[in-house]
Amino acid sequence: MPEIKLTHVTKRWGKFYAVDDLSLDMEDNSFITLLGPSGCGKTTTLRMIAGLETPTSGQIKIGDRVVFDSEAGINVPANKRKVGFLFQNYALWPNMTVYQNISFGLGNIKEELPVIDEEAKALKSMIKALENPGELVKLIEECRDKKGKLDLDMVYLKLIDNYTISIYTAKELYNYKLHEAADKESAAKQKKQELTAKLDSILAGHKEKREELNEKFEVVSGGKVVTRVRKYSKEEIDLAVRRVSRIVKIGMFMNRYPAELSGGQQQRVAIARTLAPEPQVLFMDEPLSNLDAKLRLEMRYELQRLHVETGSTFVYVTHDQMEAMTLATKICLINNGVLQQYEAPLTVYSRPNNLFVADFVGNPSINFIEAKGVQNENGSLDVTILDGRKAKFVPKEHLDLQRWFAERDKNEADEAARHKEKMQDKKAVEKSNKDE
């Protein structure tokens, strides 16, 4: 999965800066949380990376591809960035079933794709299933109700999940009625021979055209996979829907409507729909905010599992520091559009960059005590606090206050000089929402 790189990205409306000169490197296969108070610019940052918001200036790269560059005039549309976006309200179509919600976006994709021999692929799957007729019959028989009647929806679901096949292949496999045969072994053997002969005929046809099929049943000619601009077939769409439904465990809800699902189930459907096109990056904008406390905790574990299983890069917006601390490999803490700290959760917690970070992260909040004093030669500090009380502070690590003050003053002077130089540009706009 790709790395995401933001370079001097700014978004402003008039004199109001939603995001101010943000530079970030998000490593591949990372779980990044954008954390901060309401209105700090985290959702705007997410939307700019996804292509739903146009930055005022800067550059954004996803992998090796520049998707936005203000100077070069590049702005790749959102639907061409190969990213998935999970909205806060899930955005499920109420008039569509779960299956239709997940498959809807797949039907609109048209791009250069490998040519796949789907018939050969389905035949190979059925031949493999028929190699163990006892297991196949057992799967079907397990789907009988108390009256002995087969639940066909359950039969198809078991066949789909057990053999990783589409609904169309599952129906064809069931229609062989192997479970009704007197001699199941002989019936399976005969059907397997028929399917093998058919598969051999297809492979021979490819050979005549000087083609072959690879392990994914893609057509290979001259050592290269044959591609063409096309849409996904019904078989491919169904396989994709079934794949993501297994990941988020919603296979049994395919025929239900969103109104018939709980909040957690609706979220799983939204996640499945986002994962179906196999996006390079997955963006989530406070997806747990509508759930109750217990369900939020459960879904955090689900998101961690998904991150490990999919290997995707996750970028997650939240103002809940507990979510950020438990989910993230790195926390990007923003305030008033300005990056405050970008490090691992424990580093942000134990070594805050400034007073804002120290105050924002942690529950209960940290206590700030104003103190005046001097530093001794051994590094300890004699201080006066709380209306004249004397105290001695011994730092855990070596602390040179004089050096710290000198560096602070230098950084402030450098920042003031950079700002002055920036404001000399005729295109520069003074920030109305001043930093604290």
Label the model's feature ranges:
Residues 35-37:
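The feature captures the beta-strand-to-loop junction immediately N-terminal to the Walker
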Residues 50:
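Helix-to-loop junction immediately C-terminal to a conserved catalytic motif
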Residues 58-70, 119-124, 128-131:
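Conserved ABC transporter NBD signature motif
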Residues 67-84, 108-111, 115-117, 127, ...:
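ABC ATPase NBD coupling module
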Residues 96-105, 110, 114-117, 121:
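Short coil-to-helix segment of the ABC ATPase nucleotide-binding domain corresponding to the Q-loop/switch region
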Residues 100-104, 108, 227-356:
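ABC ATPase nucleotide-binding domains
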Residues 308, 313, 318-426:
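Internal alpha/beta loop-helix hairpins
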